[in-house]
Amino acid sequence: SLSAREQSHLSVSSLLLRGKSAEARAAVYEHVKEWPCDVLIAQMCTSVFGLIGFSGLPGREAEQLSFMTNLTPNYGDDWWCKAQLAFAQLEVGQLDEAGINIEEALLSNPNSAHSKHIRAHLYYENLQDEDGLSYLQRHWENYDPSGALYNHISWHVGLWSLETGNLEQMWNVLDKHISPDNSQGPPLNVLTDTAALLFRAELAGVEVTPERWRDLSAYAMTKFANPGLGFADFHAAITHARAGNIEALENIIANAKGPVSDLTKKVARAYLYMQDANWLSASELFTSVVREHARFGGSNAQRDLLDFSLAACLIHQGRKREAKTILAITRPRALQKDIISGLH
């Protein structure tokens, strides 16, 4: 017969596999009360793509930190726990604490791609772009392209290449390591990383051919035909808007589901307005979303797209001072370099 722990394993896993994410999240909490060091179950609620990250709940970043803080006393010097705690800390702005924990995690397991990825986020949040690119590129070049994080780590390299002015390298990384044609990564990463890098490039004033957007729109329709995962849907909305695939975009607006469907519909409509150069209507929708876009899940770095989109809409209206004020409060990194065209 199964032990109580094994029965709980099966129950939690069954809920997750059946798509009952809210129930699975609650079941994880119950499981780790009794067996806190059961990493297979605990990890379901960790990181920005986990059951807390994609819960759609207001305050989910604080909940993520609380979850990891409560687990930590049971793990001692375990590198995995320190890395996950560091990620939760840096996402709420506890950068010094995150730095201590991620360095300790890397000392214990210097070969962890997950820990290196978290260290890259710390470089990003500390505005250390050149140092971050140098650090990550050394490790990325020796990382197996079939690795689970290869696609996303490539995105960080490509993004930093863009932000440090190396466009040739950005396109090389995008085409060979991120885009659907060549990536071995999970579809969620392939779509979101490709869309994000292309749109961030456009926001910075780099020309992106319509063919790139049309190809990615076709990929999004194949892999994410039915709206439901808000983080994927808002990247698909960008893609469909830029590709001129209005039917697919309107499908997201009409049929968005899940815990962030309210935000998804607003963002999708905002990108439709952007495509029509209706900057005022787009900026009004983005303004209503930015204060709670953490509900989408993903990292601060990934959701910069939304803050930068609002700024771009304001700039197009001649409201540059407002754009600068908002970014100074929300994402001051945008003021450091020319990463939004027309801001300076």
Region locations from a protein language model:
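Residue at a conserved register position within TPR or TPR-like alpha-solenoid repeats
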Residues: 15, 49-52, 89, 122-123, ...
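Hydrophobic alpha-helical hairpins/lids featuring a short glycine-rich hinge
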Residues: 9-54
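Internal metal/ion-chelating core segments
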Residues: 64-164
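A conserved active-site cap/scaffold subdomain adjacent to cofactor or substrate pockets
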Residues: 149, 154-220, 233
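Short coil/turn linking the two alpha-helices of tandem helical-hairpin repeats
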Residues: 17-20, 46-57, 86, 92-93, ...
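C-terminal non-catalytic interaction modules
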Residues: 198, 266, 272-344
